Amino acid sequence: MELTPREKDKLLLFTAALLAERRLARGLKLNYPEAVALISAAVLEGARDGRTVAELMSLGREVIGREQVMDGVPEMLHDVQVEATFPDGTKLVTVHDPIV
Protein backbone atom coordinates (compact mmCIF):
# COMPACT_ATOMS: atom_id res chain seq x y z
CA MET A 1 0.00 0.00 0.00
CA GLU A 2 1.39 3.38 -1.03
CA LEU A 3 0.55 6.28 1.27
CA THR A 4 1.42 9.93 0.91
CA PRO A 5 3.11 11.70 3.83
CA ARG A 6 -0.20 13.45 4.58
CA GLU A 7 -2.04 10.11 4.71
CA LYS A 8 0.64 8.70 7.02
CA ASP A 9 0.24 11.71 9.32
CA LYS A 10 -3.53 11.18 9.46
CA LEU A 11 -3.08 7.50 10.32
CA LEU A 12 -0.58 8.34 13.06
CA LEU A 13 -2.98 10.94 14.47
CA PHE A 14 -5.85 8.46 14.39
CA THR A 15 -3.74 5.86 16.19
CA ALA A 16 -2.82 8.35 18.92
CA ALA A 17 -6.48 9.37 19.27
CA LEU A 18 -7.53 5.73 19.56
CA LEU A 19 -4.97 5.22 22.31
CA ALA A 20 -6.28 8.34 24.09
CA GLU A 21 -9.86 7.04 23.88
CA ARG A 22 -8.80 3.73 25.39
CA ARG A 23 -6.96 5.45 28.22
CA LEU A 24 -9.97 7.65 28.96
CA ALA A 25 -12.18 4.56 29.01
CA ARG A 26 -9.85 3.06 31.65
CA GLY A 27 -10.21 6.21 33.75
CA LEU A 28 -6.74 7.60 33.06
CA LYS A 29 -6.07 11.30 32.56
CA LEU A 30 -4.66 12.34 29.19
CA ASN A 31 -1.29 14.00 28.69
CA TYR A 32 -0.65 16.83 26.21
CA PRO A 33 -0.05 14.76 23.02
CA GLU A 34 -3.02 12.51 23.74
CA ALA A 35 -5.32 15.50 24.27
CA VAL A 36 -4.16 17.15 21.04
CA ALA A 37 -4.61 13.90 19.11
CA LEU A 38 -8.14 13.34 20.43
CA ILE A 39 -9.26 16.90 19.63
CA SER A 40 -7.60 16.81 16.20
CA ALA A 41 -9.19 13.49 15.28
CA ALA A 42 -12.62 14.79 16.29
CA VAL A 43 -12.15 17.79 14.00
CA LEU A 44 -10.99 15.63 11.08
CA GLU A 45 -13.91 13.23 11.49
CA GLY A 46 -16.34 16.14 11.77
CA ALA A 47 -15.04 17.56 8.49
CA ARG A 48 -15.48 14.15 6.90
CA ASP A 49 -19.08 14.12 8.18
CA GLY A 50 -19.75 17.42 6.41
CA ARG A 51 -19.70 19.88 9.32
CA THR A 52 -18.67 23.49 8.77
CA VAL A 53 -15.50 25.15 10.07
CA ALA A 54 -17.53 27.10 12.66
CA GLU A 55 -19.21 23.90 13.89
CA LEU A 56 -15.83 22.19 14.20
CA MET A 57 -14.33 25.10 16.13
CA SER A 58 -17.16 24.70 18.63
CA LEU A 59 -17.02 20.89 18.62
CA GLY A 60 -13.30 20.96 19.39
CA ARG A 61 -14.04 22.65 22.73
CA GLU A 62 -16.47 19.88 23.73
CA VAL A 63 -14.27 16.83 23.15
CA ILE A 64 -12.59 16.67 26.56
CA GLY A 65 -12.88 18.53 29.82
CA ARG A 66 -10.37 19.80 32.34
CA GLU A 67 -11.03 16.85 34.65
CA GLN A 68 -10.00 14.39 31.92
CA VAL A 69 -6.44 15.68 31.47
CA MET A 70 -3.34 15.81 33.65
CA ASP A 71 -2.58 18.91 35.70
CA GLY A 72 -1.12 21.71 33.61
CA VAL A 73 -2.35 20.45 30.24
CA PRO A 74 -5.18 23.01 29.84
CA GLU A 75 -2.74 25.84 30.54
CA MET A 76 -0.28 24.52 27.94
CA LEU A 77 -2.89 24.01 25.25
CA HIS A 78 -4.06 27.37 23.91
CA ASP A 79 -4.88 26.44 20.30
CA VAL A 80 -5.20 23.28 18.25
CA GLN A 81 -4.84 23.74 14.50
CA VAL A 82 -5.88 21.01 12.10
CA GLU A 83 -5.81 21.04 8.31
CA ALA A 84 -9.05 19.28 7.40
CA THR A 85 -10.44 18.27 4.03
CA PHE A 86 -13.90 19.59 3.20
CA PRO A 87 -16.01 19.04 0.06
CA ASP A 88 -14.80 22.42 -1.24
CA GLY A 89 -11.13 21.94 -0.38
CA THR A 90 -8.68 21.90 2.50
CA LYS A 91 -9.09 24.43 5.30
CA LEU A 92 -7.25 25.20 8.51
CA VAL A 93 -9.49 24.77 11.55
CA THR A 94 -8.31 26.48 14.74
CA VAL A 95 -9.83 25.49 18.07
CA HIS A 96 -9.10 28.19 20.64
CA ASP A 97 -8.77 27.14 24.31
CA PRO A 98 -10.00 23.59 23.60
CA ILE A 99 -10.01 22.39 27.21
CA VAL A 100 -12.42 24.32 29.42
Curated annotation (Swiss-Prot):
Give GO MF terms, alphabetically.
Answer: nickel cation binding; urease activity
Q: Which domain of life is it from?
A: Bacteria
List, alphabetically, the Pfam families matched: Urease_gamma (PF00547)
An example GO biological process term is: urea catabolic process
Q: What is catalyzed by this enzyme?
A: urea + 2 H2O + H(+) = hydrogencarbonate + 2 NH4(+)
* Signal peptide start-end: none
Q: What is its EC number?
A: 3.5.1.5
Main location class: cytoplasm
Q: HAMAP family recorded for this chain? A: Urease_gamma
Q: Which family does it belong to?
A: Belongs to the urease gamma subunit family.
This protein's name: Urease subunit gamma
Q: Tell me what organism the protein belongs to.
A: Pseudomonas putida (strain W619)
